[in-house]
């Protein structure tokens, strides 16, 4: 009975600790800055890809165009878009923006002494678990939300036509490379998988920044070293 009560109290403190960390992670200026930077880049990438598509293929007689399967959302969304430098900038900066979102928080709280106040209300284990979960989710969101925005922008103007393997080498994601089978057979699942993978790695980068802060106390170094 006593063990059950203690276990229940541990769960409550864990939940409260996680809620606190999530609130801090998603309600700080650097998270918003990272998110805004990435959203601006992906929206610009979407607009440029739409303009490039219009210029290259035109939409006047799209239904009669034999190259219609090439002029598809799955060719022009940010993961496969080669019409501008914006997608490259997004993916190059992603490790930095992921770490900037909340990866620096532990080093800041350690230097300020805030962590001592936190550990009065919860255990060190709960604090660390909550910190890593919140950091991962914040890092994942600064990738997921901008990519979703890019997809929405492109999808408003370019149809989600299923890719045709007949035009194999007209696609960036041609057969034989990662997830190419999924790209040609179930493109929407490919799009979801690539978005989730990017978000996953973005969250991992953020957690690397957090892990580094156990050894390095400088906030700038903690944020930028995983990017390098």
Residue ranges and their predicted role:
Residues 102-138:
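Helix-loop-helix units of permease transmembrane domains in multi-pass membrane transporters
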Residues 38-103, 133-206, 210:
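Secretory targeting signals
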Residues 34-39, 219-228:
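Central hydrophobic cores of alpha-helical transmembrane segments
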Residues 5-39:
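Aromatic- and glycine-rich beta-strand/loop motifs that create alpha-glucan
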Residues 29-31, 123-125, 129, 218-223:
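Membrane-helix interface segments
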Residues 34, 206-219:
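Juxtamembrane helix-break-helix junctions at the cytosolic face
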């Amino acid at each position: 009975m006593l063990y059950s009560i203690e276990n229940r109290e541990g769960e409550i403190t864990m939940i409260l600790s996680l809620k606190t960390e999530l609130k801090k992670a998603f309600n700080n200026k650097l998270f918003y800055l990272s998110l805004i930077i990435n959203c601006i880049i992906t929206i610009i990438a979407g607009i440029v890809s739409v303009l490039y598509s219009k210029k290259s293929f035109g939409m006047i007689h799209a239904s009669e165009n034999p190259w219609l399967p090439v002029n598809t959302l799955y060719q022009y969304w940010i993961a496969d878009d080669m019409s501008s430098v914006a997608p490259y900038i997004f993916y190059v900066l992603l490790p930095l923006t992921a770490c900037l979102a909340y990866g620096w928080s532990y080093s800041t709280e350690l230097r300020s002494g805030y962590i001592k106040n936190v550990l009065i209300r919860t255990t060190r284990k709960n604090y660390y678990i909550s910190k890593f979960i919140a950091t991962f989710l914040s890092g994942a969101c600064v990738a997921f939300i901008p990519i979703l925005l890019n997809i929405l922008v492109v999808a408003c103007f370019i149809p989600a036509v299923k890719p045709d393997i007949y035009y194999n080498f007209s696609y960036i994601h041609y057969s034989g490379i990662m997830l190419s089978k999924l790209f040609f057979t179930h493109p929407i699942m490919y799009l979801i998988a690539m978005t989730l993978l990017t978000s996953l790695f973005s969250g991992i980068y953020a957690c690397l920044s957090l892990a580094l802060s156990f050894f390095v106390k400088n906030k700038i170094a903690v944020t930028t070293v995983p990017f390098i």
